[in-house]
């Protein structure tokens, strides 16, 4: 009989134990919350009837709002699963620390990411490293948000030290995934203090964010994809820009597959079935107005009238977004994570696409690096900051800038990472030290 006390015997066991950390435990986070909160509450998305978006977009969610409850459960599922893995591998005496540490680091990476989300979303939460202990003594005090961030950073620092230089398999994280995630968490924590209107950030953590981002930038195994649209093609999963992505199973069962297309696709002509519930999910005008003329990111992100997509309805020469019948609600629809039907790609089935969900991309690390250099200054023309900020703009087909402000970085992050569940957290990060501005 396989049990927790006899499973963790070989490196193959360690590898098998960490595999579900890339999909199953994240499913309830990914299914509706990833974009519902990150983009709905961030005012990128609006929805008149979709109860997984409009409570966030309308700022009417409660502690019982479905996706919020699901996300809480998902994040603590990650914590408890990683605890079992970490303690199970540690308890193995037949393998060396050299063999065990990379798998412990993989689990601690996931736990660190989960706690970084818990800190930004709920603030004071329970920190737990032993699932059995929590079951035996379930009444536990929450820890201050500063301690939660510190815990997340310690996990990610361990991961950066012990994860392999190169991923052990496609889609698995490596030490640069950890450095990239550390750069985000350091940048966030730099602004946190007891005064939400301090208007300044901790320079030590800004420096740490810069150093962690530079570790990733200097690794030549990572580079921006040439074509922004390619980032969201199934056959481009685990590309040169991916630092951490959820890995969904082709033709997978519920809980192991990516369901986002169901909620984003605007009509069944795209999916080839009735699972196309995005006909009333639209871009907020506010985000569309932010795009500069010629920005190549708009069409791969949002579907507007007349936009053509050759990868959808391939047999018919592609799909063109057209206006709906008179009298129906229309708008600019979601395109990211919308991949088509099984006729377009045999890996797609009803309610299931295997496209990865991005959790961290190289482009974001470039923008983190630029923001860390900007720091507390009103603007910067620092050569390094401008080089990496403009790399992101160049791919988007936009003219380079000679200097940047926080507002430039805010807008660039919003458009680069739109529908990737990040913009609300950008606003929270800013509100840690400039709350009135964000309000």
Region spans (language model):
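Conserved, well-structured interaction surfaces
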Residues: 10-11, 15-29, 51-122, 137-150, ...
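C-terminal substrate/ligand-recognition segments
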Residues: 300-392
């Amino acid at each position: 009989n396989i049990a927790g006390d006899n499973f963790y015997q070989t490196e193959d066991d360690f590898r098998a134990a960490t595999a579900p950390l890339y999909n199953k435990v994240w499913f309830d986070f990914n299914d509706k919350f990833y974009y519902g909160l990150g983009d709905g509450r961030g005012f990128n998305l609006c929805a008149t009837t979709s109860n997984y978006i409009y409570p966030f977009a309308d700022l009417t969610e409660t502690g019982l709002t479905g996706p919020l409850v699901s996300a809480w459960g998902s994040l603590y599922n990650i914590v408890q699963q990683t605890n079992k893995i970490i303690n199970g591998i540690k308890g193995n005496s037949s393998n060396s620390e050299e063999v065990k540490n990379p798998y412990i680091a993989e689990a601690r990476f996931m736990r660190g990411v989960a706690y970084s989300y818990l800190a930004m979303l709920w603030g004071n939460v329970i920190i737990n490293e032993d699932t059995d202990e929590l079951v035996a003594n379930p009444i536990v005090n929450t820890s201050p948000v500063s301690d939660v961030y510190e815990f997340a950073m310690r996990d990610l620092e361990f991961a950066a030290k012990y994860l392999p230089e190169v991923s052990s398999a496609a889609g698995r994280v490596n030490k640069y995934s950890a450095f990239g995630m550390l750069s985000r968490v350091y940048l966030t924590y730099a602004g946190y203090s007891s005064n939400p209107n301090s208007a300044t950030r901790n320079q030590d953590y800004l420096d740490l964010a810069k150093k962690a981002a530079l570790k990733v930038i200097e690794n030549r195994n990572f580079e921006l994809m040439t074509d922004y649209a390619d980032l969201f093609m199934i056959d481009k999963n685990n590309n040169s820009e991916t630092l951490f992505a959820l890995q969904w199973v082709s033709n997978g069962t519920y809980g192991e597959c990516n369901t986002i297309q169901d909620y984003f696709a605007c009509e069944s002509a795209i999916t080839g079935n009735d699972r196309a519930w995005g006909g009333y999910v639209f871009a907020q005008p506010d985000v569309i107005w932010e795009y500069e003329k010629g920005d190549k990111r708009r069409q791969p992100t949002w579907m507007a009238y007349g936009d053509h997509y050759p990868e959808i309805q391939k047999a018919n020469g592609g799909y063109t977004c057209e206006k709906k019948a008179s009298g129906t609600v229309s708008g600019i629809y979601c395109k990211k994570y919308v991949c088509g039907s099984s006729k377009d790609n045999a890996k797609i089935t009803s309610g299931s696409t295997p496209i990865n969900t991005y959790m961290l991309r190289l482009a974001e690390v470039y923008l983190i690096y630029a923001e860390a250099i900007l720091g507390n200054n009103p603007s910067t023309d620092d050569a390094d900051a401008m080089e990496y900020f403009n790399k992101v703009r160049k791919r988007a087909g936009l003219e380079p800038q000679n200097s940047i402000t926080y507002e430039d970085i805010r807008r660039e992050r919003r458009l680069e990472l739109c529908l990737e569940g990040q913009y609300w957290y950008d606003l929270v990060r800013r509100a840690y030290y400039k709350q009135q501005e964000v309000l």
